[in-house]
């Protein structure tokens, strides 16, 4: 079993950790952006969240949907669908001993695609911008999974 010093000396794992931190910070930004949009547009999903803006029927008018809020929320949900698999597969891939330059290409393309996807979603840019960014990031995760299965699980 590798000790902590060996793990910290693993350049691929350290690169993965750096890019994972960037992408998780971006995802946290979207969470904050959703809350910001809800507060500035006075749009809430739960009745108890409206309590500070009125009572009874008056509070219910804040219990609605808004396109700006929903757009940011959908971008955040899309991040959850893509970043979680990247984190799991990327960690296993990093520990499998891949070439540093190949791993960096995977990590950089994924992070770039996800940042571009967020820009394309929030701006909004016309399709196929968002779709291409999604599939590029998804393809990177599939590529890492394939390389991991091929090299370490002997499939």
Swiss-Prot record:
Annotated phenotype, changing residue 81 to Q: Loss of enzyme activity
Subcellular location per the Swiss-Prot or TrEMBL entry: Endoplasmic reticulum membrane; Mitochondrion outer membrane
Post-translational events: In vitro, peroxynitrite induces nitration at Tyr-93 which activates the enzyme.
Nucleotide-binding found in the keyword field: no
GO cellular component terms listed in the entry, alphabetical order: apical part of cell; endoplasmic reticulum; endoplasmic reticulum membrane; membrane; mitochondrial outer membrane; mitochondrion; peroxisomal membrane
Residue sites binding glutathione per the record: 38, 73-74, 76, 81, 121
EC annotation from Swiss-Prot or TrEMBL: 2.5.1.18
Modified positions (3'-nitrotyrosine) in chain numbering: 93
Record's subunit section: Homotrimer; The trimer binds only one molecule of glutathione.
Function, in words: Conjugation of reduced glutathione to a wide number of exogenous and endogenous hydrophobic electrophiles.
Protein name: Microsomal glutathione S-transferase 1
Gene: Mgst1
């Amino acid at each position: 079993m590798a000790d902590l010093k060996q793990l910290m000396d693993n350049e691929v794992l350290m690169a993965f950790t750096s890019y994972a931190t960037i992408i998780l910070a971006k995802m946290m930004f979207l969470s904050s952006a959703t809350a910001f949009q809800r507060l500035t547009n006075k749009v809430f999903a739960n009745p108890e969240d409206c309590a500070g803006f009125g009572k009874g029927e008056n509070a219910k008018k804040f219990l609605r949907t808004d396109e700006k809020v929903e757009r940011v929320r959908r971008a955040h949900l899309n991040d959850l669908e893509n970043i979680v698999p990247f984190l799991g597969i990327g960690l296993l891939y990093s520990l499998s001993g891949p070439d540093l330059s190949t791993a960096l290409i995977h990590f950089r393309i994924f992070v770039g695609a996800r940042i571009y996807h967020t820009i394309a979603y929030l701006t909004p840019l016309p399709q196929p911008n968002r779709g291409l960014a999604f599939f590029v990031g998804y393809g990177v995760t599939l590529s890492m999974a394939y390389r991991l299965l091929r090299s370490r699980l002997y499939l």
